């Protein structure tokens, strides 16, 4: 931010909130490939360092400055001289430049106060996504109803671009964004319900993530005054911000919420929790189902009238914890009632007292997980292991190491499961798939290969490696902690889910 602060003062001081001229500034595109923007460990390098030379950027700016290249009609779009050059390269350079420009007013707002600077520094350290589950264990057992739903995708990115342009108060920038989307992008493939926003391909870059995150941010603004109105809930919003790598702050500093438009009685003694990961969110409350249905209707109308997004009421499910479950982060979760009887005696009379305790259960969804393994060619749709022919040309060490790494990652991720039987089945599929891949490479049968190699060591690596490591950690602790280890352990170093886990 400090690198281009001087340039911004020169451009913005003349015309307030006019971001359109920044699109044609050469230093903006130079900053696109600066170390501050390509240093993230989460985004892959696009390998444009050799192509994004200063000469190419100058040519790009020159072509953008020529108005006759930007006048496009329906009949002449294919003949446009601007499109006769490297379309993919230019589209990526321009989209990255757009992303920097539209983030400028937001970053300037957040850098204006020391308190907001602390927020920026805080969210650079990403929180583990598995820290959501200890939060569930502490809070959800005291609640009654849960709403399991998805934030609907915008029908058209023009609506998301219009919202960002309205906040930035730069109409020319909005029209240029629309022109860019029209020429370079297939609108129908940018955001689809079948794919998560975090699984964008390399061609869908930072500007689309920014627009979608801005759209989600506007939706989540409704929950800001929920937290302030509640007499019970005074917690910091518990939201994982993995997909907001380039977002400069929290939603409190994005949008003003008009809390005065809502009656105070509607939020009287509100006890509600909201958790979101990507487009999936969980809304849990202790109040009666009538209030939850009111919020369901309100959210549907909010999407319909404010975001021009139609959402069917049946897509938002409201269930009691004791009767239903919800899916989040690759787990099936529900609240189970544990009933136990305690005998009590007073004088000569004795009687039984029934004690009901709530416990959060997290279960590995074996059917969706097998479907993910089948998609990755580790087994068929019935869960029968098959060989991985793509790796058959690699060395034995490489094949075993790849399978062990996948097995460790899944075991690491699903170690918080209440029941380990499904996890052991997944390990069995991966182990047998590894053996079949090695047998395929050596042109042998599975039985002959195991007889020649010896299966015991291979089996031990798959099944006992993690257990041996953890047993060293817990060998000197009490039996109570050892029982806790045998139950479930949440690893708080997991900051994203891989493709096998992300089967929702």
Curated annotation (Swiss-Prot):
Organism of derivation: Lupinus argenteus
GO cellular component, one term: chloroplast
Family label: Belongs to the intron maturase 2 family. MatK subfamily.
Gene Ontology molecular function: RNA binding
Function, in words: Usually encoded in the trnK tRNA gene intron. Probably assists in splicing its own and other chloroplast group II introns.
Alphabetical keyword list: Chloroplast, mRNA processing, Plastid, RNA-binding, tRNA processing
Gene behind this protein: matK
Primary residence: plastid
Localization: Plastid, Chloroplast
This protein's name: Maturase K
Biological processes annotated in GO: mRNA processing; RNA splicing; tRNA processing
Top-level division of the source organism's lineage: Eukaryota
């Amino acid at each position: 931010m400090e690198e281009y602060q001087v340039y911004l003062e020169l451009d913005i001081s003349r015309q307030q909130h006019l971001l359109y001229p920044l699109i044609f500034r050469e230093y903006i595109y130079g900053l696109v490939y600066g170390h501050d923007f390509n240093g993230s460990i989460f985004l892959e390098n696009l390998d444009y360092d050799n192509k994004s030379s200063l000469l190419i950027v100058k040519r790009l700016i020159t072509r953008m400055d020529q108005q006759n290249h930007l006048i496009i009609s329906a009949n002449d779009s294919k003949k446009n001289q601007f499109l006769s050059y490297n379309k993919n390269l230019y589209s990526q350079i321009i989209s990255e430049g757009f992303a920097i420009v539209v983030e400028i007013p937001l970053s300037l707002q957040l850098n204006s106060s020391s308190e907001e600077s602390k927020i920026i520094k805080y969210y650079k350290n990403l929180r583990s996504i598995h820290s959501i589950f200890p939060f569930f264990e502490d809070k959800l057992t005291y609640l009654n109803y849960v709403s399991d739903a998805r934030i609907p995708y915008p029908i058209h990115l023009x609506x998301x671009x219009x919202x960002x342009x309205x906040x930035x108060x730069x109409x020319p920038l909005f029209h240029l964004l629309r022109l860019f989307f029209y020429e370079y992008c297939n609108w129908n493939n940018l955001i689809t319900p079948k794919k998560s926003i975090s699984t964008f391909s390399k061609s869908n870059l930072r500007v689309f993530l920014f627009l979608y995150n801005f759209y989600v941010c506007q939706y989540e603004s409704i929950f800001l005054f929920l937290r302030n109105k509640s007499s019970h809930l005074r917690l910091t919003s518990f939201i994982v911000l993995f997909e907001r790598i380039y977002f400069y702050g929290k939603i409190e500093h994005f949008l003003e919420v008009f809390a005065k438009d809502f009656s105070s009685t509607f939020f009287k003694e509100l006890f509600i929790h909201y958790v979101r990961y990507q487009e999936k969110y969980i809304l849990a409350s202790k109040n009666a189902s009538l209030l939850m249905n009111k919020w369901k209707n309100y959210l549907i109308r909010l999407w319909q009238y404010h975001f021009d997004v139609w959402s069917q009421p049946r897509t938002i499910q409201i269930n009691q914890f004791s009767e239903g479950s919800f899916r989040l982060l690759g787990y099936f979760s529900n609240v189970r009632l544990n009933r136990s009887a305690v005998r009590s005696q007073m004088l000569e009379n004795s009687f039984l007292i029934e004690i009901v305790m709530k416990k959060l259960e997290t279960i590995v969804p074996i059917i969706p997980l097998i479907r993910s393994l089948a998609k990755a060619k580790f087994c068929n749709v019935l869960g029968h292991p098959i060989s991985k022919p793509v790796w058959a040309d690699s060395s034995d060490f490489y094949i075993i190491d790849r399978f062990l790494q996948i097995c460790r990652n899944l075991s690491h991720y699903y170690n918080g499961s209440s029941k380990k039987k499904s996890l052991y089945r997944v390990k069995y599929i991966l182990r047998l798939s590894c053996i079949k891949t090695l047998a395929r490479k050596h042109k042998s049968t599975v039985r002959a290969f195991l007889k020649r190699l010896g299966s015991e060591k291979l089996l031990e690596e798959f099944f006992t490696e993690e257990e041996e490591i953890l047993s060293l950690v817990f060998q000197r602790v009490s039996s109570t902690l050892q029982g806790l280890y045998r139950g479930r352990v949440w690893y708080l170093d997991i900051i994203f889910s891989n493709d096998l886990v992300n089967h929702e």
